[in-house]
């Protein structure tokens, strides 16, 4: 019996999305693009090799997430990062975009270096996770087949297909208020308001879509046009949104890992996500205020708030970047403690996919992409720790 056909059949039966078009392009070709080198195109749990199936599923999902993060950070690096190519981690840098870099430097003079380093880190994460999976003869994750979204046309950006869309974002900034709360915790059912309300409505671009949106302006106190500065401010808060997600996700999925070495991997990589988030949390608070900025595409007129006016309000004050002690596990039983939040493990992977989707990162993506990503997330959420 042909074992590969048997495994494909089992996965088609297990996942309804496999019945609705993914196989139409040919299992061998498309499957290789989806899962990389492994036992077969659509290996089910049997593709865990020498790993516990749950551990393999967690690592495979995180490898996919890191590819998504690497893709978006690559776009930021091309336009706004330090322009030193460091193959294989960072390539394709052609000089950046002077106006966008200037606008980012208004948040912090070291922003280009931080962007460069964050990009390098995410590349290393996805490379390591797939390499580890392969070393255990487990299926890997490879999303290259879905690099079909358009690039920015501004100077500095490569004209290549992308996994993510940074030009139609609706950014959740509730992480700002969540980490300042002394009484509330999302794991206990609490909700939080967006700190920068304008970013949580409509669609915003975090990179210049073209050179008209990336302009130096010596007459402006920021040295760039208000449109360019607004885009950089948006990026500053998006950086933190992405990395606070990773901060929680690794802690959430670590609770499902079985093998000590897999747990070590999750804790070790997760710690770097925390460092990223702390950095971007600090820099976002330096965003210059702006009034009456007109989006060249949507025509919307928007303001960016003066964050310095948050001073004295402990729910919003910019320099309160250390996690405030808050309720944990049980509000009545235990005192407040400074923690990462959320860390509830139930449906953590599916929650991460939803957050990315709500953010607008995948606007324009193929339906097969969503089916695959949700399938990987479901597998990760089904993992159970074994002792």
Regions found by a protein language model. Give the residues of each.
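All-alpha RGS (Regulator of G-protein Signaling) helical domain and cognate RGS-like helical scaffolds
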Residues: 2-8, 19-26, 35, 40-387
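Non-catalytic, regulatory and substrate/membrane-recognition segments associated with hydrolase enzymes
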Residues: 29
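Twin-arginine (Tat) signal peptide motif
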Residues: 10-15
């Amino acid at each position: 019996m042909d074992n590969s056909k048997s495994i494909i059949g089992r996965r088609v039966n297990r996942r309804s999305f496999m019945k609705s078009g993914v196989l139409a392009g040919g299992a061998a070709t498309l499957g290789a693009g989806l899962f990389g080198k492994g036992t077969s195109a659509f290996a089910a749990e049997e593709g865990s090799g020498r790993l516990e199936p749950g551990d393999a599923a967690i690592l495979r999902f995180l490898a996919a997430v890191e590819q998504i993060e690497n893709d978006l950070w690559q776009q930021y690096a091309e336009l706004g990062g330090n322009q030193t190519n460091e193959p294989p981690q960072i390539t394709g840098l052609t000089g950046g975009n002077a106006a966008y870099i200037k606008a980012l430097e208004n948040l912090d003079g070291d922003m280009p270096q931080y962007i460069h380093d964050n990009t390098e880190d995410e590349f290393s994460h996805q490379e390591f996770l797939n390499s580890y999976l392969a070393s255990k003869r487990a299926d890997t994750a490879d999303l290259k087949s879905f690099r079909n979204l358009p690039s920015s046309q501004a100077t500095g950006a490569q004209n290549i297909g992308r996994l993510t869309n940074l030009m139609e974002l609706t950014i959740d900034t509730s992480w700002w208020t969540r980490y300042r709360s002394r009484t509330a915790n999302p794991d206990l059912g609490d909700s939080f308001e967006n700190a920068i309300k304008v970013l949580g409505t409509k669609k915003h671009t975090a990179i210049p879509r073209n050179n008209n949106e990336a302009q130096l302006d010596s007459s402006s106190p920021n040295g760039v046009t208000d449109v360019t500065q607004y885009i950089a401010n948006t990026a500053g808060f998006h950086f933190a949104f992405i990395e606070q997600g990773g901060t929680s996700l690794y802690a959430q999925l670590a609770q499902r890992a079985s093998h000590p070495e897999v747990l070590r991997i999750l804790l070790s990589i997760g710690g770097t996500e925390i460092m990223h988030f702390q950095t971007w949390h600090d820099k976002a608070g330096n965003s210059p205020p702006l009034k009456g900025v007109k989006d060249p595409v949507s025509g919307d007129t928007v303001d960016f708030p003066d964050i310095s006016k948050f001073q004295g309000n402990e729910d919003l004050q910019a320099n309160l970047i250390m996690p405030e002690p808050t309720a944990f596990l049980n509000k009545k039983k235990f005192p407040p403690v400074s923690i990462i939040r959320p860390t509830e493990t139930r449906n953590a992977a599916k929650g991460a996919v939803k957050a990315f989707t709500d953010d607008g990162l995948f606007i324009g993506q193929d339906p097969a992409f969503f089916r695959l990503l949700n399938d990987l997330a479901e597998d990760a959420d089904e993992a159970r720790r074994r002792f």
